[in-house]
Amino acid sequence: MPKLKTNRAAAKRFKFTKNNKIKRKSMNTRHILTKKGPKRRRRLRGLTLVNNSDWKSIVRLMPYGVR
């Protein structure tokens, strides 16, 4: 059986944690930040976890990311 290819777009956007949860960057942080308050911008700064319902589809894109 041939090697599976990793989707490069997904590999750049997602990282796996030690417990196989998936981290992603928060959305709404690219532009038009002037109308967003400082508290909201601070909250959006960090990484968040991907929802469990999306986990399976992301794992299919990154077959070697899961431990």
Curated annotation (Swiss-Prot):
GO MF annotation list: structural constituent of ribosome
Family: Belongs to the bacterial ribosomal protein bL35 family.
Disulphide linkage map: none
Protein name: Large ribosomal subunit protein bL35
UniProt key word Ribosomal protein: yes
Keywords: Ribonucleoprotein, Ribosomal protein
A single BP term in Gene Ontology: translation
